[in-house]
Design a protein with these regions (language model features):
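Active-site cofactor/cluster-binding pocket
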Residues: 1-180
């Protein structure tokens, strides 16, 4: 099994954090992992993406040009990465901020209104975890038991009280994802 993922959106949407948490969850399952971020000089508002590879075998290269899954959080990222999803692959997107939705017919397309899920949970900062929940519902590559461990590894100890909130957002995101 090998899953090549691109997660892309604006800086501040938790793109890199989502990739890191997913990577740590996979590490807890003794999987091979690469996590390769890319972002501009802006702290927030610039585009950011992270390439994550999860595999049960050695990963020969972290460089990927075609992905099994694209998780897209803004129009610029959709324009850039929709064409990089392998035929038969998966594209998950949040329709908020997307003017021209994905159009490919050779891939599975799902949407998640993550802003709404985060509002229901009560904290806009868990937006990215709602999106991750959508991904894990469709592709349960990492076990739900390891999510706590992945969150604990990525969330600083002083914010450990937020682990339950993040996990709740993941669970709600799993319920809210829609296949198109």
């Amino acid at each position: 099994m090998k899953e090549e993922i691109i997660i892309a959106g604006f800086g501040g949407q938790g793109v890199l954090s989502m990739g890191k948490i997913l990577a740590y969850c996979a590490i807890m399952q003794d999987m091979e992992v690469t996590w390769m971020p890319s972002y501009g000089p802006e702290m927030r508002g610039g585009t950011a993406n992270v390439s994550v590879i999860l595999s049960d075998k050695k990963i020969s290269s972290p460089i990927v040009t075609k992905y099994d899954t694209a998780i897209i959080l803004n129009q610029q990222s959709l324009d850039k990465f929709e064409s990089t999803v392998k035929p038969g692959g998966l594209l998950i997107y949040d329709p908020n901020g997307i003017i021209n939705p994905p159009t490919r017919t050779d891939i599975k397309i799902c949407k998640i209104d993550a802003i709404n899920v985060a509002a229901q949970v009560g904290n806009a900062k868990v937006y990215n975890m709602a999106v991750m929940g959508a991904y894990l519902k469709i592709k349960p590559i990492v076990s739900f038991d390891n999510i706590d461990k992945g969150l604990a590894k990525c969330i600083p100890a002083r914010y450990s009280d937020l682990i339950a909130l993040n996990k709740q957002a993941i669970e709600e995101g799993m319920k809210a994802v829609e296949e198109l």
